């Protein structure tokens, strides 16, 4: 199993508070964040046990969902639903995104 999968689960757990704040103000945006963040874990989990192009496709979808999750948080901040995000959460978001980019692009 990839170590990054555990980090993704930590990110999802860290989103409980911000997600609740967002959902109080904008249920649609909250739902979108919930679906996108779950999609990261689900596609990463599926990709870990896939092969070839299917593996790459799952990791690519996970990367897109990770960017969508981050964008949901950025939009929520822009609308004033959230204050500053926790530095540790931001670091984990960036770490997951970077790892997924490397998984999709492969070794250089």
What do these predicted regions represent?
Residues 1-108:
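Amphipathic alpha-helical assembly/interaction segments
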């Amino acid at each position: 199993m990839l170590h990054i999968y555990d980090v993704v689960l930590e990110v999802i757990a860290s989103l409980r508070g911000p997600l609740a704040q967002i959902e109080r103000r904008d249920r649609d945006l909250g739902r979108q964040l919930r679906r996108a963040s779950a999609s990261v874990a689900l596609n990463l989990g599926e990709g870990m046990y896939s092969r070839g192009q299917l593996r790459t496709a799952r990791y690519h979808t996970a990367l897109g969902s990770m960017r969508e999750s981050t964008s949901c948080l950025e939009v929520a901040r822009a609308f004033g639903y959230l204050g500053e995000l926790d530095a540790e959460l931001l670091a984990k978001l960036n770490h997951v995104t970077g790892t997924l980019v490397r998984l999709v692009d492969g070794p250089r």
